[in-house]
Amino acid sequence: MPPTPWAPHSYPPTRRSDHVDVYQSASRGEVPVPDPYQWLEENSNEVDEWTTAQTAFTQGYLDKNADRQKLEEKFRASKDYVKFSAPTLLDSGHWYWFYNSGVQSQAVLYRSKKPVLPDFQRGTRKVGEVYFDPNVLSADGTAIMGTCRFSPSGEYFAYAVSHLGVDYFTIYVRPTSSSLSQAPEAEGGDGRLSDGVKWCKFTTITWTKDSKGFLYQRYPARESLVAKDRDKDAMVCYHRVGTTQLEDIIVQQDKENPDWTYGTDASEDGKYIYLVVYKDASKQNLLWVAEFDKDGVKPEIPWRKVINEFGADYHVITNHGSLIYVKTNVNAPQYKVVTIDLSTGEPEIRDFIPEQKDAKLTQVKCVNKGYFVAIYKRNVKDEIYLYSKAGDQLSRLASDFIGVASITNREKQPHSFLTFSGFNTPGTISRYDFTAPDTQRLSILRTTKLNGLNADDFESTQVWYKSKDGTKVPMFIVRHKSTKFDGTAPAIQNGYGGFAITADPFFSPIMLTFMQTYGAILAVPNIRGGGEFGGEWHKAGRRETKGNTFDDFIAAAQFLVKNKYAAPGKVAITGASNGGFLVCGSVVRAPEGTFGAAVSEGGVADLLKFNKFTGGMAWTSEYGNPFIKEDFDFVQALSPVHNVPKDRVLPATLLMTNAGDDRVVPMHSLKFVANLQYNVPQNPHPLLIRVDKSWLGHGFGKTTDKHTKDAADKWSFVAQSLGLEWKTVD
């Protein structure tokens, strides 16, 4: 079909004010910065009316695609297949695992009726019994289960519940003798205890050895779940099962450092409680350790501050007595494993598994009472190795696999489970059994079977291209085997490039369906700012060097066209959250004609205001701080809102945000689209925004129906903006 007709300069009106903010620059002194759309930061009737008008205008454009409903139906069908997690054996003798029959919004927690591992290879038939079904927590599917944890005794199940995807959760507790499979009358589900622990955000649930209570992180109560005020004054509390939250003990809070946040864990033997302390989103934390007190948790936990300077990343793997094993990047950008002896006056730190210079250590688990399984990422492909109790590499596991792997296990048990996935691998779970003969230890436990799609019809390859400064960057390219690399295919280019997060291969039935339907390819460049190659790769794409991230992303699109992987003008870029920032920044930076379309979901766009809202202060380690004069110049230069060009044609652009997004607040998308529409009113391609007022959070936990409808809007926009032809026969 030809691109949907577009009449420039037809947007709903947007008021401009004379608001000006003044910043301090180390090179320029006082810098006045006009902010005519400052009023879009507010929760006001005017903003509500404006977003309603803009969204209705966008919907009018989307409604012109006659294939949109048909595309939504194909997306929904593509998601209808059985999904599952690796199982875990509790001390109670029950196996537990998550299972989704197809299009359930949330996976259901099942358990075995006997201590024997169920036979999961019996087709797609369900095995075991339902223990906890989070889909019945609310009639409309808006109650979402987040983190959850069983007590060491297996007697209790603690689970966090959020509504409409907000980042704040309430933790509930229920006995494992009480299942939930039908719609409840009580908040959090019938059969639970009266405990309700509120205002938890980015929390872990760490049970104490005696199973009498757990540690969690919370914030002070707010007037509203979607208040935009800056997050501060996090605290770690201890909740004793069967008591009210008012009785909870604060075990850690630092009023002098209100931006600090915390994570907790406990050793599997119950000997130690671990506390990690973060000052921002950088890969630097403190590590404090305390021995579990048999008399219970008290307000003044005697923390031993093993690592008490922010300089590197430290995360405990396990302990053998007083010797703890820690994964760290101290003097090792690619990470290594060290041991720390807590029995000495001054903790002794020694290398255990040394750094590999050409591969990043991403995950390490202790297995079978002292062995270790380590996953390395070499050129963005996972490799799995088994190590001895002495730290010697013994063997490589599943050497023929290409993709992403993860480990599920309990270290005292003789079995571990490896989950494999990739662009055309929906999911395979293998079991590694130390009690079996060497050649029979690794076996397939369960394989995902699709309905409608054939994953074998797709293939992926990895290429390397040069960025603007000559740096070589890897990129995955995925296609349906019938799609030719002859310069005629449209391309979907997805990226992230920030916070040391790796853009791993991922399985998406919706993406594969779109590719098959329109003959498109998928490109995923592993740009700087991510974690693909350790700390140096991240450092090369943050703060002052953040421009490299955009250069890498733009160069990827140019490479696709030049080498005939994609057609000129047919590259559509997409990204969410920080990836949305990547999209917005690339739109305003790229030469005219580089992209044909762009979709940003919940993206950061106003870099002069981001750290004033919710958790934004933590991102200053990534973006810089606009209120520090030494940072101001490079932050302003990075900000999409403040760098919209007036002298060139921009690609068709759709910004998607939720009205109550409490992580990346919607003002980012609102102000960016207002500037786009004002600066280039005669742009021959639409510059649109869709504000969802039915969902509050950053995108977490959407129902299957809602996720499918959102995807249909997104990909329908791409198809109609690029003028893509429906190729498959239905």
Curated annotation (Swiss-Prot):
Its EC number is 3.4.21.26. SUPFAM superfamilies: alpha/beta-Hydrolases, Peptidase/esterase 'gauge' domain. This is Dual function macrocyclase-peptidase POPB. Expressed in the pileus (cap) and lamellae where it colocalizes with amanitin. Belongs to the peptidase S9A family. One of its GO terms (molecular function) is serine-type endopeptidase activity. Keywords: Hydrolase, Protease, Serine protease.
